UniProtKB/Swiss-Prot annotation:
InterPro entries: Cyt_P450, Cyt_P450_sf, Cytochrome_P450_monoxygenase. Pathway: Hormone biosynthesis. Heme binds at C464. PANTHER family: CYTOCHROME P450, CYTOCHROME P450 MONOOXYGENASE. Its cofactor is heme. This is Cytochrome P450 monooxygenase abl1. Keywords: Heme, Iron, Metal-binding, Monooxygenase, Oxidoreductase, Virulence. GO terms for molecular function: heme binding; iron ion binding; monooxygenase activity; oxidoreductase activity, acting on paired donors, with incorporation or reduction of molecular oxygen. Cytochrome P450 monooxygenase; part of the gene cluster that mediates the biosynthesis of abscisic acid (ABA), a phytohormone that acts antagonistically toward salicylic acid (SA), jasmonic acid (JA) and ethylene (ETH) signaling, to impede plant defense responses. The first step of the pathway catalyzes the reaction from farnesyl diphosphate to alpha-ionylideneethane performed by the alpha-ionylideneethane synthase abl3 via a three-step reaction mechanism involving 2 neutral intermediates, beta-farnesene and allofarnesene. Its EC number is 1.-.-.-. The gene is abl1. Induction: Expression is induced during the early biotrophic stage of development. Expression is positively regulated by the ABA cluster-specific transcription regulator abl7.
Length: 569
């Protein structure tokens, strides 16, 4: 303190000697600002200097973190951090990341006093109200979560699984009607399985949250250009979220009030906000019949119309791209592993032939299929759908992990990329895709491994509220796509050496193709029609004779081209 006062007095004396000109005043201000910033950097460096970091820039500034996030290689860089530097790694002046599941479980335990860091405020899009994601205080968050969880878990929403079933049926129907019904002489249509997965999750969430689907799947259209705008801005928004001084400005209430999305916008997230407002207002004003959906559950528990809008919109932001990403990653890993592909088809065949299975399959039925569960969990493990920092602030008087003291106020972040590739948790072959790792264990050990994978969705009081919905979507879509397509059609990769090009910005984003004509045809068609269970029916126009078609997708973004064979009956 004495040093600071002495330095400032010398600067003021210098300014007085030079005359009270504007240039002298500016010199004093700039020099003072530089000195103040250096002092803060040195102080921050000293308090965590015992924690290893990948770069000196990570210890004294946010240059390393911003560059890593903006590069689109966040997943791969963070995946290798702890193998190189140990269980605790410093990635910012006040940020430490860990892949230790015991630390993460302790932080999220019910009696924990850790609070969320201001990173979570990047989920704020309404300047006047917080949502479940942006409530930082653990006690306030617990109260809000207790109030809304019955809607997410299905306790108040018996129609939850019914809505998802309807969307799965619609997805399968669209793939059959639009991409298999090819008249003689016509070129086969193109299907973008990555994008259509986004449309599926968008319609599921909008129907669950607001009682009405927007029609992404039916129209195969990015309504309001919501998905396009999110993908376009993802690098900038993710980088802004990871740099405190930027996020504190961009996501502050005054800035959101003037520059944030509005209900009156014609496209982007604001336009979707307007559509959500219309549906919520209609439900509140007209007293529509009971629909047993999430909106009704929130209304029953005293949520105002604005709170219903906000929670529904946040569910839309958090539950669409993440679940679609998981669907894409599971599909591409199955297709690139012939042994997995064959075992999964064998389990589905025996399941359909051995006992009656609902259409679409019920979640309880899917959970009884051990290899299907192994495929889903291993797909999530290989490419976790959520890769944010999710920082929690160390409470007073500080904490000690792995013999290292962590001062109070430090943000401890989750490194899901490294956690799910941990060799101590998943075996020496953790870098390899192997669903069989779950099949070789005792029941207790398998359940423990599955719980470690589920850390991708958080834990304890900070667990993702939409986890149940996400697993319901994954089980149904993965089973039905394999049952309706993989059992009937042989699928080949468009580019075996690079089946799917993705970038990582707090999640794995499939890159769009460079140009619409960027594709090549596959001529080999394999007859897979024998042994198809008749309970999986095709529309009448497909039943007259065996037809073969090629189902193509653009290069790069969606990784699959499928030779199609329709079974005769």
């Amino acid at each position: 303190m004495y040093c600071d006062s002495f330095f400032m007095s010398r600067l003021l004396s210098l300014a007085q000697l030079s005359g009270s000109s504007w240039s002298s005043i500016c010199l004093v201000c700039v020099t003072s600002l530089v000195f103040w910033r250096i002092k803060i950097a040195v102080t921050q460096y000293i308090r965590l200097r015992h924690i290893p970091s990948p770069s000196i820039f990570a210890a004294v500034s946010y240059i390393w973190l911003a560059r890593t996030t903006y590069s689109g290689k966040q997943y791969w860089i963070h995946r290798d951090l702890h193998r190189q530097h140990g269980p605790l790694v410093r990635i910012g002046p006040n940020e430490i990341t860990t892949d230790d599941p015991e630390i993460l479980k302790k932080i999220a335990s019910s009696g924990s006093t850790y609070s969320r860091g201001t990173w979570y405020l990047t989920g704020r899009f309404n300047p006047y109200h917080d949502n479940l994601f942006t409530i930082l205080d653990p006690f306030a968050h617990k109260k809000a979560k207790t109030r809304s969880m019955p809607a997410y878990l299905g306790r108040d929403t018996p129609g939850l699984e019914v809505i998802i079933n309807d969307k799965v049926k619609q997805l399968i129907s669209i793939l059959q009607r639009r991409y298999l019904a090819v008249l003689p002489g016509q070129d086969p249509p193109l299907v973008d399985l990555g994008l259509i997965s986004n449309y599926f999750t968008m319609d599921v969430i909008t129907h669950l949250a607001f009682g009405h689907q927007v029609g992404y799947l039916q129209d195969e259209k990015d309504h309001y250009n919501f998905l396009g705008s999110v993908r376009k801005l993802w690098p900038q928004m993710s980088t802004s979220a990871d740099v405190p001084w930027i996020r504190n400005i961009l996501f502050s209430r005054p800035v959101l009030r003037f520059l944030g999305p509005k209900h009156t916008d014609k496209k982007g997230f604001g336009a979707l906000m307007g559509a959500a407002k219309q549906h919520v207002d209609r439900r509140f004003d007209s007293g529509e019949e009971r629909k047993h959906d999430m909106l009704e559950s929130l209304m029953k528990r005293g949520f105002t119309r604005q709170e219903c809008e906000i929670e529904g919109l946040f569910l839309l932001l958090s539950g669409t791209e993440s679940t679609a990403c998981a669907i894409r990653q599971i599909l591409v890993h199955v297709i690139t592993a012939p042994s997995v592909y064959a075992k999964l088809k064998q389990e589905i065949d025996s399941t359909c032939q051995g006992r009656g299975i609902s259409y679409p399959i019920q979640l309880a039925e899917a959970k009884r299929l051990p290899y299907l569960q192994a495929v889903i969990y291993e797909g999530i493990r290989m490419r976790p759908p959520l890769l944010g920092l999710f920082p929690k602030v160390v409470p007073e008087p500080g904490e000690t992990f792995h013999g290292q003291f962590i001062p109070a106020g430090t943000s401890i972040c989750t490194n899901g990329s490294s956690l799910l590739r941990s060799k101590s948790l998943f075996g020496a072959d953790a870098d390899l895709y192997n669903p069989g790792r779950f099949m070789e264990l005792s029941k207790e050990r398998r359940e423990e491994m599955e719980r470690n994978v589920e850390l991708a969705f958080g834990h304890g009081q900070w667990m993702c509220a939409g986890k149940t919905i996400a697993f319901m979507e994954l089980n149904k879509v993965v089973f039905e796509k394999h049952c309706q397509f993989f059992r009937a059609f042989d699928m080949q990769l468009h580019s075996p050496l690079k089946p799917c090009e993705v970038e990582s910005y707090a999640g794995l984003i499939a890159k769009p193709p460079a140009k619409s004509s960027d594709l090549s045809m596959i001529s080999r068609v394999t007859d897979m029609s024998r042994g198809i269970n008749p309970c999986y029916r095709y529309p009448p126009q497909y039943r007259t004779h065996l037809k073969t078609h090629m189902l193509n997708v653009p290069s790069g973004s969606n990784f699959i081209r499928m030779p199609i064979v329709l079974p005769s009956t």
